[in-house]
C-alpha cells in the first residue's frame, strides 16, 4: 500500500501533529493504545497509509517526533494518545533553538539531524511502497522552521523521487510569539520554494479571525486554533486515507494542483465552520457547503481569494450526498465566478467525495486552492522582514551562529520573485500568450504560461 511517513518538528509542529493523530485515529477506529475498535471495513481498507500494523495487531503511526528541547514532547507523551507512538521515534535535544532559525538549521539542529534521519530510514524500510513524506511545523520559531527545512533538504537528498508535503504554520503579527518571526519565516520560505512539492499555508491570523468572528470565541487559545488545523488536516488527507471516487495520492494531488513547480503554496479551507455546540440543530445542504467553502472567511490563510485568481482547486466532500448535486454546485460556482479562475487552465477544479464524514458532522467539505492571492501572505512577511533588515535589527543572533548577511538578501529576493511570479500568472490571459514571449526576456519566457 502507498505509505506516508509523517514528521513533526518543533513545538507547534508537535502540537498540531499530536492533534492530527488524535483526530485520524478516532476516524479510523483506533483507540489510544493502538487497538482497532471500529465498526466499518472502510476504516481499515487504507489504514496502512498512515499506520504500521505491529505483531501484536496494534496499529502504530508512521510518525517521527522531533524537537530541540524535551518540553513539548513530554506533554505529547503524557497526552491522550501519547502511548500510540513508537517510543524510539521521539528524538529531542536539550538546548532548544531559542526561536533562532540559524540554531535550528546550522548549529543545534544540524547536530541532531543524523539521528532523525536514522529513524526516517527505519520507517521507510517498513514501507512497501513509500509515496512520500509530510511535515508539520511552523515557520516563525527556530526548530520547526530552521531544523524543519534542514530535514526537508536532507530527506530530499536521500529520497529525491518521493513527494514532500508540508503543513506550514505561517506567523502573523496578531498572534506573535517572537519579534524575529519575519526573519525565520523568510529564511524558511526560501527553502520551501525549492525543496517541497506541496505546502499547505496555515495562517495564524486567519485562524484567529475564524475563532473570533465566526465561532464567536472571545479569547481564542492555541487549543482552539489547533482544533481548526486538525479539522483541515483531516479533510485534506481524507482522499489519501479512505477509498474514494477520485483516489488521490500525494503525487496525483501535486499533478492536479501545481501548474508551475515554484507555485505550490496552497490555501486550505473548511466548512461548516460553526461554533462547537451549535451544529446539531440543522443539517447543511450541499449548496451551503459549497458556498461556505469558497467564502474568504473560511480560508485558513489570511488572503482574500477575490484579490487574485485560482490556478487550480481541489475539494473533498465528506458524508452521504449525491454526486450529481455536488457536481452541479461546483459547476455553478465556476460559471458564476468565472473571472476568478484562470481561463488558460480549463477544468481546473477537481472534486472528491468520501462517504465517511468527520466525527460529529453529517457532512463537511475541505477546500484546497492554489490561488495567486497567496502573494498577500508573502508580501506581508516581506514587508515586516524589510523593516527590520533595513536596520539590521537582531542580525547578530544569526551571524553569531555562522550565517552570512548574503543569505538574508538571497531569501528576501527569492520571496519577492515568488510574489511577482504569482502576479505574472494572475495577469496572464489566454489571448496574450503569444505576446508574452516576444517582449519578455528569456528567463520569464522559460517560466511563461505554456
UniProtKB/Swiss-Prot annotation:
PROSITE patterns reported for this sequence: TUBULIN, TUBULIN_B_AUTOREG
Disulphides: none
Domain of life where this protein originates: Eukaryota
GO biological process, one term: netrin-activated signaling pathway
CDD domains: beta_tubulin
InterPro entries: Beta-tubulin_BS, Beta_tubulin, Tub_FtsZ_C, Tubulin, Tubulin/FtsZ-like_C, Tubulin/FtsZ_2-layer-sand-dom, Tubulin/FtsZ_GTPase_sf, Tubulin_C
Coiled-coil regions, chain positions: none
Binding residue positions for GTP: 11, 69, 138, 142-144, 204, 226
Residue ranges, annotated region (Disordered): 422-450
Gene Ontology CC: axon; cell periphery; cytoplasm; dendrite; filopodium; growth cone; intercellular bridge; lamellipodium
Short sequence motif MREI motif: positions: 1-4
Keywords: Cell projection, Cytoplasm, Cytoskeleton, GTP-binding, Isopeptide bond, Magnesium, Metal-binding, Microtubule, Nucleotide-binding, Phosphoprotein
A single MF term (Gene Ontology): metal ion binding
Annotated Acidic residues bias: 429-450
Tissue specificity field: Expressed in the external granular layer cells of the cerebellar cortex (at protein level).
Modification Phosphoserine, positions: 172, 444
Domain text: The highly acidic C-terminal region may bind cations such as calcium. The MREI motif is common among all beta-tubulin isoforms and may be critical for tubulin autoregulation.
Job of this protein: Tubulin is the major constituent of microtubules, protein filaments consisting of alpha- and beta-tubulin heterodimers. Microtubules grow by the addition of GTP-tubulin dimers to the microtubule end, where a stabilizing cap forms. Below the cap, alpha-beta tubulin heterodimers are in GDP-bound state, owing to GTPase activity of alpha-tubulin. TUBB3 plays a critical role in proper axon guidance and maintenance.
Subunit structure: Heterodimer of alpha- and beta-tubulin. A typical microtubule is a hollow water-filled tube with an outer diameter of 25 nm and an inner diameter of 15 nM. Alpha-beta heterodimers associate head-to-tail to form protofilaments running lengthwise along the microtubule wall with the beta-tubulin subunit facing the microtubule plus end conferring a structural polarity. Microtubules usually have 13 protofilaments but different protofilament numbers can be found in some organisms and specialized cells.
Protein name according to UniProt: Tubulin beta-3 chain
Organism: Mus musculus (Mouse)
Recorded name of the encoding gene: Tubb3
